Amino acid sequence: MSSVKRKMPPSSLLQRRVKPRYEPEPESDIEEDVSEGPSEDDVGLSGSEGEEGGELSEDESGSGSDEDNSDAASSSEEEDDEEEQEDDGPPIDASQLSFGALAKAQAAMRSSSSKSQKASDAAKTKEDEGYGHPTKLSSAKKLDKRSNKHAPVELTSKKPVSRKRDFLTSTAETKRPQARDPRFTPLGPGASTAAAGGGSGSTIDEIKARKAYAFLDDYRASEMQELRATIKKTKDAAQREKLQRALLSMESRKKAQDRKDRERAVIEEHRKKEKELVKQGKTPFYLKKSEQKKRVLVDQFQGMKKRQVDKAIERRRKKVAGKEKKMLPMTRRGAEER
């Protein structure tokens, strides 16, 4: 009885794992190894030849199939050996390399260094775009601990200056109220709301400032007396006229302040009377602006003589007539004067 060997398909022969045999490393150059080693086309051809041999073995005897199997096994072993030689190649000697290979290596190193430089530049630009604000890494740095809990905290003075200038925006520093001289700005911080017609904060501030700086009236009176004395002594006409204008300005400011004080006194007196009436159960009565002016005029004329009252009325009549003439057109102004 003849022993029949089992045939294996050629595809399984190519995929079968074969243990590589140990061979000493060749002492030739890399170029010789590449030239001696079979290319991928050769491997493909050998595989195709193995397939053709497998087809022929079906018609031929069993001895032919054994030879094909041995050829396929040897080709797979050679392929594995070549892969190992490619992975674990011998160390390259720089003296044996050509100038072209060295130039390519230098170009590759330059390109890698330029890429790293570009990455660092991009990181710097991102930091600059942050307008100098500290990042998470910089804020994470902790300062040294204090030697004592009562010791002052040490802060670094090397803080980056922001590129953003917010002088046009409203910040906390611009909103912070600044100290002002009440002689020149008596209305205080609520002047804007009072000018718009809503809010009595400005009047309250003005009353407080007036009471707190009432002693300035004595200083102004003494200054006016000194000005009158210097006007009498000066002989230069230009200097004398300049001093007279200054004295007239101070007198007009004093008259305006006295008028405001009288108006405020009239309103305060009316409020006191109304508070007493409200306590008795009556409804409060609020004065209109026109009624306030009438009461102020009555109070002003009460302390004057008849001649002074006539002068004040004549002055007021001329003032009102001048305002009315300004409102008329030029043609009618001439007719009115005639």
From Swiss-Prot:
Family the UniProt entry places it in: Belongs to the RRP36 family.
Superkingdom is Eukaryota
The stretch of residues making up the signal peptide is: none
Question: What keywords does the record list, in alphabetical order?
Answer: Coiled coil, Nucleus, Ribonucleoprotein, Ribosome biogenesis, rRNA processing
Note the subunit structure.
Answer: Associates with 90S and pre-40S pre-ribosomal particles.
**Coiled-coil regions, chain positions:** 221-280
Residue ranges, compositional bias (Acidic residues):
25-90
Annotated localization:
Nucleus, Nucleolus
The entry's cellular-component GO terms read: 90S preribosome; nucleolus
**What is its biological role?**
Component of the 90S pre-ribosome involved in the maturation of rRNAs. Required for early cleavages of the pre-RNAs in the 40S ribosomal subunit maturation pathway.
Please note every region of biased composition (Low complexity). 103-120
GO BP terms, alphabetized = maturation of SSU-rRNA from tricistronic rRNA transcript (SSU-rRNA, 5.8S rRNA, LSU-rRNA)
> What InterPro entries does the database record attribute to this sequence?
RRP36
Asked if Aminoacyl-tRNA synthetase is a keyword of the record, the answer is no
Q: Where is this region: Disordered?
A: 1-203, 307-338
* Organism classification: Eukaryota, Fungi, Dikarya, Ascomycota, Pezizomycotina
For bias type Basic and acidic residues, the affected ranges are: 121-131, 163-183, 321-338
Q: What is this protein called?
A: rRNA biogenesis protein RRP36
- Main site of residence? nucleus
Q: Name one Pfam family in it.
A: RRP36
